[in-house]
């Protein structure tokens, strides 16, 4: 086991506890990265001004820099620090808060869902982006196309993608850009109007970050839904519990984003450790969530957990602006899956290959 393999391991949490016991911020000679595993170290890294989301010398990964996916990547607020992060965020974050949970539930319920493996896959990997696309003003048919294209686009965010997948990501970025250019020429939806009124930037920045909103929805929400179903399979007595409460604990207990990275821009000291410019820190968000100094009885799955604290959606200036929306879509989707009568005890799964995500892929589903 190492801190990267852990993300898709059947049960990485005892290993994370071992890492925390060895020190909150330590160097792993096997993967040649600093590893932040304690809540204190994770908080310090995420808050530090010299810890950037991309290396200074490579703001866009070389593998995609020459194509449209790289062009979009370079403008994403989640992949930038400073003004290129703050300006789009200031437009998108408050606008997302205007979305009503009832509206989300209605959009999820309107989708045709079948109680089989294919239906479950679509509910996890296509439905959530379709909801966001509809909120932005696309028709249901366009929303389905946006979902498919987003699935291709997110390949550009993973170092595990091959040349074929990266070529598909570039093509998807081109097509998504075309869809958004057409959308912006139409009278805007309430959500798009709110974002446009707040944005201090050009149309290309807006389009890139709307694509980014779809891609973050795709990645975060699929894992939330899947890990909630696993929690319900293990604790079937929770089927009738509040889905909002269930998802709030799932995102802490078994998050879909297990780790992130930070790149040291200038030599600095973090949590008593000296780091040099150019070094890389693997930030174990999922480990910090299980730190007893952050949450009492962290190994227990408690729906009524008092003062729940979590790093699953980041922290500080890069905290995910779509957290409430992702949780709302996931809660509505899980409830819809349960209402379809799916037998969770017959689910089998493995985790999608990833360096940082914990997203189950289900099979052998019987109605």
Spans of features found by a protein language model:
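Cytochrome P450 heme-binding Cys-pocket and its upstream "meander" loop
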Residues: 204, 244, 288-328
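Cytochrome P450 proximal C-terminal region
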Residues: 16, 327-367
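Cytochrome P450
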Residues: 134-141, 229-240, 289-293, 340, ...
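Cytochrome P450 catalytic core segment centered on helix I
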Residues: 148-200
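Cytochrome P450 C-terminal beta-domain/meander region
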Residues: 197-203, 261-282
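Active-site substrate-recognition loop segments, prototypically the cytochrome P450 B′-helix/B-C loop
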Residues: 1-122, 129-147, 151, 155-159, ...
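Cytochrome P450 catalytic-core helices
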Residues: 206-241, 321-342
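Conserved cytochrome P450 K-helix E-x-x-R motif and the immediately C-terminal K′/meander segment
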Residues: 186, 240-273
């Amino acid at each position: 086991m190492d801190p990267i393999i852990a993300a898709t391991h059947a049960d990485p949490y005892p290993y994370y506890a071992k890492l925390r016991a060895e020190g909150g911020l330590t160097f792993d000679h096997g993967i040649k990265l600093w590893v932040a595993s304690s809540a204190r170290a994770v908080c310090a890294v995420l808050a530090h001004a010299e810890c950037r989301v991309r290396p200074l010398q490579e703001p866009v990964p070389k593998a995609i820099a020459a194509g449209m996916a790289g062009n979009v990547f370079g403008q994403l607020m989640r992949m930038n620090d400073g003004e290129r992060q703050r300006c789009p965020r200031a437009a998108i974050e408050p606008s997302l808060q205007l979305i009503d949970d009832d509206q989300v539930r209605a959009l999820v319920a309107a989708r045709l869902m079948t109680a089989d493996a294919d239906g479950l896959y679509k509910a996890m990997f296509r439905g959530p982006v379709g909801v966001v696309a509809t909120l932005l003003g696309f028709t249901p048919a366009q929303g389905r196309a946006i979902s498919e294209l987003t699935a291709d686009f997110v390949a550009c965010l993973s170092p595990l993608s091959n040349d074929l997948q990266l070529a598909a990501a570039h093509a998807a970025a081109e097509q998504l850009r075309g869809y958004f250019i057409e959308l912006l020429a139409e009278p805007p939806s309430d959500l798009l109007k709110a974002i446009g009124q707040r944005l201090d930037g050009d149309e290309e920045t807006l389009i890139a970050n709307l694509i980014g909103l779809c891609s973050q929805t795709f990645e975060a929400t699929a894992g939330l839904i899947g890990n909630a179903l696993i929690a319900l399979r293990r604790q079937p007595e929770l089927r009738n519990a509040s889905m909002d409460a269930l998802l709030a604990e799932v995102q802490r207990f078994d998050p879909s984003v297990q780790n992130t990275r930070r790149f040291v821009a200038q030599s600095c000291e973090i949590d008593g450790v000296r780091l040099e410019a150019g070094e890389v820190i693997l930030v174990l968000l999922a480990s910090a969530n299980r730190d007893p100094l952050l949450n009492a009885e962290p190994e227990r799955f408690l729906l009524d957990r008092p003062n729940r604290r979590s790093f699953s959606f980041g922290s500080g200036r890069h905290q995910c602006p779509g957290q409430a929306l992702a949780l709302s879509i996931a809660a509505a989707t899980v409830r819809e899956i349960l209402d379809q009568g799916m037998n969770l005890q017959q689910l089998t799964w493995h985790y999608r290959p990833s360096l940082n995500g914990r997203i189950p892929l289900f099979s052998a589903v019987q109605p």
